[in-house]
C-alpha cells in the first residue's frame, strides 16, 4: 500500500511539474512575442523620430546612406550639433587613427606630475601645440594648457576660477544675444552663489565686476564676435570652439587671457568628450585644475590618447596634403563639404521665399591663403512669413526639428539649424525646406 501511494505521489508530482513547465513556456512565449512587438513598434517610432541617431551596430548604419520609402515621413532632427558629417572623412582613413591601449596602461590617476595640469597626457599637450601652430588660430606660447571633459566642463571651471570667492554677491555672467543656449543653464545650474547669469551683454549696465563670454565665431549666428561691455572690472572668456578653417577665415592667432577649444567641432569627435583651455594666468589655471580635480578627479586618459592621435593625423594631413598618404587635408575636405552645404541651403531658402539667412563678408584666411566666406556650423534661419511668429513650431509642423530663438535670448522668429549631420539627413532637410511654400 505504501509502495502504491509512493508511486502515485511520484506520478502526481511529475504531472504537476510538467504542467508548470508547459505553463512557464507558454507565458514566456507570450511575453517574448509581446516584447518583440513592442520593440518593433518602438523601433519604428525611434526610426521616425531620431533619424540622426541610428544604431552604429545595425547593418543600416554601416551601409551607404540611401533614401528609404519611409524617409519622407521621418522627422529630421537638427536641433543638436552632433557632428556626424565628419564620418565621411574618417571612415576612409582606416587604421590611421587606431590606437591600442594595453590593459595595464592608464591605471593611475596621474599623467605627468611635473605638469601643472597633472592629469593631462603629455602626448595630448604636444599635439595641441602642434595643431595650433599648423592652423595658426591660437597663440600657445606663454600659456598653460588645461584639459577638460569637453569645453563645457572647462567653461564651468573658468567661471569657478574667475569668480570672487570672498564676495557677498555672485558675479554677473553675460554674453551678447544671440548667445549659446546652454550658457544661462550652465551658469545657474548648481546655484553656486559665486556667479549668476545676467543676460545680454549688450544691455548690461551694472557698475560692478562681470564675466563676459565671447563666442567667436558665434553660436548660433556665425558672426565674428568681440567684447561688448568693455568696462572696468570685466573678465573675458573666449569660447573658440568654431575658430577653425572649415567654418571661418583664420585671420590671426587668438591671443587671449583664456580661450576654450574642443575636439567636438574641430575634428568631429564629440564622443571623446575632450576639450582644452589656453590660460595665461597661472593662478587662474590652478583654480581651473582644482575645479576639475574636485569635479571628476581628472580627465579620461584613454580619451586624451585617442584625441592626441586624431589631432596628429589632422596635422599630418595638412603638412602632407597631396602626397601618397593624404590626398587632401582634413580642413580642405571639411571646407569643401561646408561650402556645398551652405550653397544648397541658400538655394533652398531662395526657392521657398519664406526665410532669410545672415550674409557674411569674405575675409582673408591665412590657413588657405585665400579670401573666403564664412560657413558656420549652424544656420541662423529667420522666418519672414507675416503670420508665423514661432519659426520652431512652424518647421516642426513640416517634420523639421530646430532650436528656437527664445533659447538664445532673442525672438521666436529665429531658429538654429545644425549643418553638421549626416549627408542623408541633410539632403532630406534641404528637400523638405525647398518644398515649403506660403
Each PLM stretch: what is its role?
Residues 2-438:
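PLP-dependent class I/II
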